[in-house]
């Protein structure tokens, strides 16, 4: 029991064992993960820079998009650098407090990601259903408060799960079969009763994911009713195209999230562990990687802004 702090049942550190059963191919698995992370960082920073520089994108919709990009960067950066160190250099040890901190940030940022998608759905709803009041409803003050409350909600709901995990006794060992510190992955190696952790995790998922999905569903129901009532086919097409990128972002976020959540709580014995670990990594990587691409392809204003940016750079180089 050398991994314990004296007589305490709190370990000094944990060992993140990577992807169980696939240790021999850790290096090969790291290449697609590293590629996706590089695309995510480049794409999201590029999108934020574009929105900051182009005055045509200084509208609530794109402010929320910049907030989504910022959240995406934080979400994937909370795990991927450490995961790559595990896969590349076999550096598996993580301090107990660092593990709890990583767990806190992972769940806070994933909760914030869901919240921002919900805010973007409300933004689309106001823009399509109440176009004349759009500018007066979504002021800079309202946007800032909404973003802050979304972050605060994640923090306040995740903090208890961190303390619930910290209180557990770890007498079975300190090896976690995962690439990062996830709430239930850490709790499951405890020799204590983790029922409270599991129930609280389910409550948080319902409070965040359930509430956000309900708001998104109501928003899109109102949008659909408003669009169907439009007399012009072009207007209907324009309204639908406005929501396409956001709908893709919702699918990319919630499908792997639900898979990861339900396999953790209900499918632990039916889903192979290595599949669960891979999906848990893709769950944090897929949205940050694909969101800039989806919004770049599907959103006309973003495409035009990219073209203007490169044309401006080309003109400046010619003048030089």
Swiss-Prot record:
InterPro entries, alphabetized: GPCR_Rhodpsn_7TM, Olfact_rcpt, OR51/52/56-like
Glycosylation sites: 5
Gene3D superfamilies xrefs: Rhodopsin 7-helix transmembrane proteins
Residue spans crossing the bilayer: 28-48, 57-77, 102-122, 142-162, 199-219, 240-260, 277-297
Subcellular locations according to the entry: Cell membrane
Topology feature Cytoplasmic, residues: 49-56, 123-141, 220-239, 298-320
Disulphide-bridged cysteine pairs: 99-191
Record flagged with keyword Disulfide bond: yes
Bilayer topology: Multi-pass membrane protein
PANTHER family: OLFACTORY RECEPTOR 52N1, OLFACTORY RECEPTOR 56B1-RELATED
Record's function text: Odorant receptor.
Family: Belongs to the G-protein coupled receptor 1 family.
Name of this chain's protein: Olfactory receptor 52N1
Species: Homo sapiens (Human)
Phylogenetic classification of the source organism: Eukaryota, Metazoa, Chordata, Craniata, Vertebrata
Gene symbol of the encoding locus: OR52N1
């Amino acid at each position: 029991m050398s991994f314990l702090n004296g007589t305490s049942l709190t370990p000094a550190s944990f060992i993140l064992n990577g992807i169980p059963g696939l240790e021999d191919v850790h290096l090969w698995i790291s290449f697609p993960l590293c590629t996706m992370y590089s695309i995510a960082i480049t794409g999201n920073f590029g999108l934020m820079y574009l929105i900051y520089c182009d005055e045509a994108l200084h509208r609530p919709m794109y402010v929320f998009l910049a907030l989504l990009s910022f959240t995406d960067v934080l979400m994937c950066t909370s795990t991927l650098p450490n995961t790559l160190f595990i896969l590349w250099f076999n550096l598996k040890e993580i301090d107990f407090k660092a593990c709890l901190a990583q767990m806190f940030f992972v769940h806070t940022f994933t909760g914030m990601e869901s919240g921002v998608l919900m805010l973007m759905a409300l933004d689309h709803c106001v823009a399509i259903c109440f176009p004349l009041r759009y500018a007066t409803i979504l002021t800079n003050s309202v946007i800032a408060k909404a973003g802050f409350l979304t972050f605060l909600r994640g923090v306040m709901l995740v903090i208890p799960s961190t303390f619930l995990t910290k209180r557990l006794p770890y007498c079975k060992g300190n090896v976690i079969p995962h690439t990062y510190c996830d709430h239930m992955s850490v709790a499951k190696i405890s020799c204590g009763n983790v029922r409270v952790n599991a129930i609280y995790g389910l409550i948080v998922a319902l409070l965040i994911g359930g509430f956000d999905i309900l708001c998104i569903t109501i928003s899109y129901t109102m949008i659909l009713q408003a669009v169907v009532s439009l007399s012009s086919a072009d207007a209907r097409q324009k309204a639908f195209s406005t929501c396409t990128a956001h709908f893709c972002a919702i699918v990319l976020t919630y499908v792997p999230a639900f898979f990861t959540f339900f396999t953790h709580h209900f499918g632990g014995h039916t889903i192979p562990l290595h599949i669960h670990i891979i999906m848990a990594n893709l769950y944090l990587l897929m949205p940050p990687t694909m969101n800039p691409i989806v919004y770049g392809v599907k959103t006309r204003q973003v495409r035009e802004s990219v073209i203007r940016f490169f044309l401006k750079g080309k003109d400046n180089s010619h003048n030089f």
